[in-house]
């Protein structure tokens, strides 16, 4: 079907006839610029006086112009060396906000019996706090290495691997579906960047939120204006 703007800023690329929220058992969110309003790595870089440099790499990665996401993240994290944990806490307290409709959508999903997964190419410093704030069931993201309260410019390997990139997001979605005993077609995946496309491609419903052009085009549904909870206009 041709993309159809069913109301201003809400576009359906693939027909989703009469879907109900209760048809699904899991919703997976990207964090940066999807569930929250910022790219955390860019804001941490601001404390090091390197925001422009880091943000340029982030933008290229999210547009899908960088083929090696892991290497791009390593480059950005290396530029954070010397930033204090206190500066990261300040980013969390003063700059990070949930995007409009985030809390309402998460609560509606929980009320309908869905489990909630947060998968991020960002960092546990932030995903753990968002998890606790919203009562999220599962998370996967990257650990920043610190020494004496300062970032070393490196990340810590975890039991599942080294970096949560697009492929790891896809694997985590599938793993979580396996744990729940459900099909990936019973999952919703929401994101904004190229590294969200692998998990969005596995889900029964893929939703782009204020996304890069390539992601808007490939998602089944695109929310281009308004809050995350606009999904509830389609999936009641």
From Swiss-Prot:
GO terms for cellular component: cytoplasm. GO terms for biological process: L-serine biosynthetic process. It catalyses: O-phospho-L-serine + H2O = L-serine + phosphate; O-phospho-D-serine + H2O = D-serine + phosphate. Signal peptide: none annotated. InterPro entries: HAD-like_SerB (IPR050582), HAD-like_sf (IPR036412), HAD_sf (IPR023214), PSP (IPR004469). GO terms for molecular function: L-phosphoserine phosphatase activity; magnesium ion binding. Its EC number is 3.1.3.3. Coiled coil: none annotated. Pathway: Amino-acid biosynthesis; L-serine biosynthesis; L-serine from 3-phospho-D-glycerate: step 3/3. Its cofactor is Mg(2+). SUPFAM superfamilies: HAD-like. PANTHER family: PHOSPHOSERINE PHOSPHATASE (PTHR43344:SF2). Belongs to the HAD-like hydrolase superfamily. SerB family. This is Phosphoserine phosphatase.
């Amino acid at each position: 079907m041709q993309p159809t703007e069913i109301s201003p800023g809400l576009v359906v690329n693939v027909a989703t006839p009469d879907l109900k929220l209760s048809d699904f058992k899991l919703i997976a969110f990207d964090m940066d610029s999807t569930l929250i309003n910022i790219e955390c790595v860019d804001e941490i870089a601001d404390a090091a006086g390197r925001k422009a440099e880091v943000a340029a790499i982030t933008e290229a990665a999210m547009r899908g112009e960088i083929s090696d996401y892991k290497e791009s993240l390593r480059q950005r994290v290396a530029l954070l060396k010397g930033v204090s944990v206190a500066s990261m806490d300040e980013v969390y307290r003063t700059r990070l906000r949930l995007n409009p409709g985030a809390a309402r959508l998460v609560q509606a999903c929980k009320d309908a019996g869905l489990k909630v997964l947060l998968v991020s190419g960002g960092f546990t410093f932030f995903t753990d706090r968002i998890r606790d704030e919203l009562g999220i069931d599962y998370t996967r993201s990257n650990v920043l290495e610190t020494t004496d309260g300062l970032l070393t410019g490196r990340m810590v390997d975890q039991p599942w691997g080294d970096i949560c990139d697009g492929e790891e997001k896809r694997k985590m979605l599938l793993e979580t579906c396996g744990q729940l005993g459900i099909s990936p077609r019973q999952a919703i995946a929401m994101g904004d960047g190229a590294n969200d496309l692998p998990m969005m491609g596995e889900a029964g419903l893929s939703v782009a939120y204020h996304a890069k052009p390539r992601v808007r085009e490939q998602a089944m549904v695109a929310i281009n204006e308004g809050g995350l909870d606009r999904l509830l206009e389609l999936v009641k």
